[in-house]
Amino acid sequence: ALWTVAIKPDKTQAFEQIMAKVRAALAASTDSARQRQAAGWKVMKIEKPLPDGNIAYIHVISPVVHDADYTVMQILYDAFPDERQALYESYRDAFAANLSLATGPVAVDLAPKPATATAASH
């Protein structure tokens, strides 16, 4: 999945701190689904500002963990219940817009195929 969000240019550090908290929440979770989410979730920052001045961040999620909740705030609320209000305000103040969400199966995997056991033994 590719999920693109726009973040206010003066709030990129706050957004990245929020995402670091998400990483910490996923890493500390005893839920194997949450740990698998962390393993396949990266966030890329686009250096060139959007026409409106906001900064685009692309969440690259592969593989998507079936039935897992990727809601940033829910992950944070579950892990840091005492910080709910502060986390919400920080995220709200940084967030400008959801720009796009693309999901679907991989049509073509360009990664090299691993050698099969029989081919490796010859």
Spans of model-derived segments:
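A mature extracytoplasmic/lumenal domain signature
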Residues: 9, 19-21, 47, 59-65
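Short, surface-exposed, polar/charged, turn-prone segments marking secondary-structure boundaries
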Residues: 30-34, 69-73, 85-89
